[in-house]
Amino acid sequence: MKIQAVLIDGFKNLSDVKITFDNITALVALNNFGKSNVLSGIDFGLAFIKASIDDKMEMMANSNLIPINQSMQGRNYKFEVEVLTEEAGQEYRVQYGYEFAWQCDEDEVPEIVQEYLRIKLDEKGQKYTQLISRTAESAMYKSSETGRCSSKIKVEPTELVVNKLRAYDEIYYADIIRKLNSMKFYMENNLDAKSFYRPDPIIRKGIGDMMIDAENLPRIIYQLKDKFNDKYELLKDVYAQLFPDVEDLIVKQYKINGADNDKLPDDAPFVLTNSIYVLYVKDRNLAHPIDFVMMSDGAKRVFMILTKIILSSASNVSLIAIEEPENSVHPRLFQSYIRIISQLLDDCKIIITSHSPYIVSYLEPSWIHVGMNRKPGVAEFFTFKKSGQKQLQQDAEEFHMSMGDYLFSLLADSENNLDDYLECDVNE
């Protein structure tokens, strides 16, 4: 599934945030605004779909996530995801969403109050067909291709219809139901990547070597080279484009003794292996290869992120979030870095966050969602008007400022005229 957009409302300080995804999408705002809350809101929304009924109840009562801003108190959580998917050789646009009432005190009962699923052929003139329609009083689904969305289905107050329908193998949109229940999101917010390069004989259960959330990078690279050598060579090539002095990457396996899993309890969350892996880098300026852990912080993080992106297709990840990708990266390197990331993407999309003015200069304006407060403490994000992109650049040049510096000066000024540039009404 190729994710196209998400809508989040009633999560921490987020109010009706609609993010439309390009290959790369950037959330740009001042510090302590709510950029990370958007990423957490997406993670929460997709995790809620896959969670058990008991876990859903706990999630609906998480007091750390319930809006406490005075203008948002009592607001329900809403989540919608829009995706493109191919079925029988045709591409369909799918909209799936749900809404629930937070459990704000012990006497309240958490409850899903709305849920819907609709699809259409992704062609001009096509209309959506309703497949799921659920309110607080009833839940219905479309049981046949020729029927209406009127078949009743019994669900628990904290159970989603899209979960219940996983057992309905005979419905004609069963594949879409399966895909919605298995969408994956990966958040990369490790500003210090050093721990990912250390030799480690411990493997967490349930996480394979080729999964995007595996933590032992040398082991991942060893498996990538062994099973997907073309992807391994691609990784080496793009990394060398960013760091031309790197001539080669070398990963070695070392056998060790003492990996006795029989002594571990059955419920231990990890297993021990009899091998460790070390990643080396051959630099044209050095007499011999060095352990990758000796590379700079920026070089280590860039390599880790490129690896995760290449793994995204094997891990069926729809969206990768990267916080502050410019961290420890020189501005000129960042421009090439973003270009390479864009080229590596298949069906996966990237969303990044930043509070750095210079990053704006290296991004396409259409990628950027600008965060602003129309109400104190409430986070909203808006894209540029088509005319606003050019106007912002011209106005910045008049003040002899970069576009990023000028944009952030406006964000810091309570008397700004951002509605001249953004798709919003500041006074609304």
Where are these regions (language model features)?
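Short, solvent-exposed loop/turn segments that connect beta-strands within catalytic domains
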Residues: 87-92, 105-109, 258-263, 270-273, ...
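Electropositive, glycine-dotted interaction segments
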Residues: 91-247
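Extended helical coiled-coil dimerization/tether regions that scaffold
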Residues: 215-292, 402, 411-412, 416, ...
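Short glycine-/polar-rich loops that comprise or flank the Walker A/P-loop
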Residues: 77, 181-182, 364-367
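Short acidic, glycine-rich loop/turn motifs
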Residues: 10, 81-89, 119-121, 281-285
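Conserved P-loop NTP-binding catalytic core
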Residues: 40-110
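Short, low-complexity Ser/Thr-rich regulatory SLiMs
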Residues: 100-104, 253, 372-373
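Switch/communication elements of ASCE P-loop NTPase nucleotide-binding domains
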Residues: 1-51, 271-428
